[in-house]
């Protein structure tokens, strides 16, 4: 059986989240943001949803799936210096993403879970969806995947260990690399869990290739750096399409040949 192409992986991703899970498909926003003066280029799938993360009542859908064209050539996510130096970095790439914007029903479910000492349903949902897609839809061997969790995120570790069933050696604690924010200023922040693929040998000095980052926006950071609970927690995930293609096709690097005009 031949390895799936980038187009096939895109299709499977959308079909999984839209067809099986009921997410709403949102088209890629322009690589050059039209109404965001803080960015020269769109560098992540969550960019077009910034306002929704800040106020979930603005969200037109609770669950969303996208394939976002991204460029990282400056700012917080600047991959420009790594392009050509490693096989895994590209200036222009596509990010597969799914997002959850909690509403009153989610808030009630979160409160009920907390009262019972159970983990966040939003976290459990996001982790389960990602794991199922990788191991059942793409059929990646579970034993070749490893995850990281923030050292203080006992919920995520519990979900991976006790619900998904990963052994302890496949769940690694992290620090700053497992804490997400939009930048240095005010805005939503929270822990993240990352899923890595075992390349079995070092490639550009790295044995483990990061595939998917699942961000749990749980707190709001004020301008003075103080943290408070986010009234409506959200989930933001992103997975590099090119990296998934490289894994499934067993090649070191897979830049896509179907790039579209940047300013469309």
Describe the role of every protein-language-model region.
Residues 1-264:
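Structured aminoacyl-transfer and RNA-binding surfaces used for tRNA recognition/handling
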């Amino acid at each position: 059986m031949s390895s799936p192409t980038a187009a096939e992986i895109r299709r499977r991703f959308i079909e999984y989240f839209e067809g099986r899970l009921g997410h709403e498909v949102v088209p890629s926003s322009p690589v050059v943001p039209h109404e965001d003066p803080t960015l020269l280029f769109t560098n992540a799938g969550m960019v077009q949803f910034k306002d929704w993360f800040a106020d979930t009542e603005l969200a037109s859908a609770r669950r969303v799936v996208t394939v976002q064209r991204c460029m990282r050539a400056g700012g917080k996510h600047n991959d420009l210096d790594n392009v050509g130096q490693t096989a895994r970095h590209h200036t222009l790439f596509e990010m597969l993403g799914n997002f959850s914007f909690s509403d009153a029903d989610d808030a009630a479910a979160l409160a009920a879970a907390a009262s019972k000492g159970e983990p966040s349903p939003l976290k459990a949902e996001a982790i389960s969806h990602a794991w199922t897609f990788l191991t059942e839809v793409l059929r990646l061997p579970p034993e070749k995947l490893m995850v990281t969790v923030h050292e203080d995120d006992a919920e995520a570790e519990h979900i991976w260990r006790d619900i998904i069933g990963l052994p302890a050696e496949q769940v690694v604690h992290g620090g700053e690399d497992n804490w997400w924010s939009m930048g240095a200023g005010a805005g939503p922040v929270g822990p993240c869990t990352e899923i890595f693929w075992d390349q079995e040998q070092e490639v550009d000095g790295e044995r483990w290739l990061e595939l998917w980052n699942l961000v749990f926006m749980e707190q709001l950071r004020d301008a003075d750096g103080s943290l408070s609970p986010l009234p409506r927690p959200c989930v933001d995930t992103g997975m590099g399409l090119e990296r998934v293609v490289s894994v499934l096709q067993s090649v070191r690097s897979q830049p896509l040949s179907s790039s579209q005009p940047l300013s469309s």
